[in-house]
Amino acid sequence: MVGRLEGMNDAIDEFPGLKARTLRFTCGAPRSARAIGDGSRALFLRSDGPEDTVTSLWMSVIGSDGDTDEILLADPRTLLADADAEDVPAEEKARRERAREGGSGIVGYSVDAAGNRVAFTINGQLFLTDIAAGVTRGIAIDEPEFKPVLNPRISPDGRHIMYTTGTYLVDVDLADVSDTTDAAEDAGDAVSIVASVPQDDADDVADTQDGTQDDAQSDAAESQAGEWKIGLAEFAAGEEMDRYDGFWWSPDSKYVLFETFDASHEQTWYIADPADPTKPAQARRYPQAMTANADVHLTLLELGYDTDGCYYGGIAHNVEWDRESYEYLAAVSWTEGHEPLLLVQDRLQQHDQVLAVHVGEPIVTMSAPENGFTDEDGSEVETFSIAIPEYAPGEEPGTTRVLEEHSNDCWLDLIAGTPAYTPDGRLVCAMNDMDADTNRLTVDGTPFTPKGLQVREVLDVTDNDVLCVVQRTPELLPAADLPFLWQSNADDHDARSFDVVSIRYDGDWEPLTCTPGQWTMSRSGDGCVVTGRGMDDARSQMQHCMNVRTTEGDVADGVADGAEMMSMVVSPIENHSEIPGFTPNVRFTRLGERGLYAAVILPSADSAYAHADQLPVLMKPYGGPGFQQVVESQSFYWDAQWWADQGYIVVTADGRGTTGRGPKWDRAIYENMKAVTLEDQVDAVYALPDALASIATKTGVAVPKPDLGRVAMIGWSYGGFLSALAVLDAPDTFAAACAGAPPTDWTLYDTHYTERYLGLDPDTYERNSIIADAPKLSRPLMLIHGFADDNVTIANSLRLSQALMAAGRKHTFLPLNGITHMTNDETVARNLLLLQRDFLADALV
């Protein structure tokens, strides 16, 4: 018993440092899985150990005989001597910040349709893995105008890699690379500029191999420091729409859609390093609420190839839609055999359109021997001409037609994976069904997903079904109506559980994950990869599954000789991540008249506070729109357990606006985030005594009583806003708070997020700000903010601090030099926990 107690206490003591060193216990865990080909193979990323941040590319294989294996395809340290140095382009750093990517090495990859070739970058250098050959080679890009290499995407046919430099869209012909280029040699003629940023309000420039490439390079070079970008997602798309791509291959590899945007109308913001007064501030464009967005354009590029399949030239067409009314390009989807789909939104996100883009006929390149010539090496150069089809008015490539329109009085949600065509041409879209209070899917305009299954994400669309992540609303879909596989744990399949299900177009559905938790899936052919975790496992799980056919002539369990059988092979992918060394002591409950989903984390059984009669309460919410923290996933409560073992009853309550409970619940905060989200946290506090008494009665185990005279709140981002708000506007309930990166003034946040909830009326922003509340402060408040935060600028905390100073209100401010919206420094992350602990201990005496 003594040894166990010491071990538990050691784990709690070591948690802050261990969490920081392991990137929140993610190092060594497999991630980013994708089933490929017939499903017998699956790609994934994983680093070598629990404190190794450098991720490698791996493949899981299930053989026809059911044997399984994990194969290392690409190790950054083998491919690059300086792989640990983490020298990536600034644009890539920005993309990773948008995606909250903290790893290094190979952090993303692109695979062709057959699952044979994989493209990726390491420290800004381009690489290609040929899976069948078992070879990974570097593609050296030496010419300055062809760099940096950003967002490489391999063509579906595996013959080309397209990437962007931000100024140019660049094609790499892999036939030329494979034949002529070794890893250390410049790719040379294999690399071509296919399009550049526009110049002087001209159309996008496509390379036509007739001398205009030089003009494109010359014009674009003049604007390299300008405001136009090509092939990249603008800030609002990456930060708020979860759209990180800025160009898209057609399934037949004959077209590319690419984005260009002009950020010159956006506000110019500056990120400074106050610790180094000699270092100039970095200027960047930011889509500040109630100001102009980037001007986003889309271009359809028809690609021409020579007889060797190498890029020869192209024809660019502007994609036309009502950009003045629908300025947000929210999603792009392209299904084989069909036109590409766009989802565009208006400024307030109350109206959207699903558009089909006409692509026309693929261009034909014809040999033009009369234009042939001999190059300086004496080699004959074959030349080609491009045949340009004629189209009737309104049918030209780049024209669009409206397939569906949607509207909502508050806002329309973006559901990842929609819109999409089924292979046979039916249109699948998302629907906020207010009458059914369910986020649903439609096929050709008709809802088909069940009432009470809140669709969170679409993972795959076939002619037979849609694979999606859902959350059940028990009030709308009772346990008696659930499939057999969920009957034994029906009470846990609710808003806390992100479940993968298959839903057919007649409304029938079946669960593909049975254990409540946070799950996702990738499928291909007869195989799939399931990734996620529940409450029982400290480590995330990844399982590669494949239906394997028995060989002809097998006999088993009375099955006749020669009959075909299918058996499921499940291959767990190894996880090398660290674990905290303790299991959170979590009790789920519902709080208050609104039945808020809540997690109560009590001191561990071995803690010195386990048998305390009464303990202070620490509210630890996010509490804002679009994100939940009460989830059936153990990792959500590790921080909370550390706090509980410092002597607190820790409570996380998901109030109105958090996802998973239907569109009406989400929209209860519309134009009134501040008051509604605080009210729910106050209600949670006062509902806590009865909830704890009920827990004690049900379990037969005594639990500490909550000391409602000593209630504190901590949080980050929206949780930071809520924490500061708690002590400003509800000091009778909350005795102290630590507010990390709080958006104190919503006019300083971005357009797409903020205007969705607050609209465009300045009075609404003033009502939801907490700057004017500064004179009310009568409780201890700690503000924490990173100077390098390009998401929630430190100006938010500085303005609140200035207002507090002007009002003569004592407070603590921890400005963090070099820290972004992620606390990505080991020492800082560790010490932040300890400093907050000590601050609250003093404040609650």
Please provide the spans of the model-predicted regions:
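Conserved alpha/beta-hydrolase "acid-adjacent" motif
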Residues: 791-799
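Short beta-strand/loop motif that positions the catalytic acidic residue
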Residues: 777, 783-785, 789
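Beta-propeller folds
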Residues: 1-501, 505-510, 516-517, 845
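Non-catalytic accessory segments flanking enzyme active sites
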Residues: 32, 54, 107-108, 119, ...
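Mobile cap/lid helix-loop segments that gate and shape the active-site cleft of serine hydrolases
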Residues: 680, 735-736, 741-779
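C-terminal catalytic histidine-bearing segment of alpha/beta-hydrolase fold enzymes
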Residues: 411, 798, 805-845
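Cap/lid segment of the alpha/beta-hydrolase catalytic domain
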Residues: 571-710, 714-722, 729, 744, ...
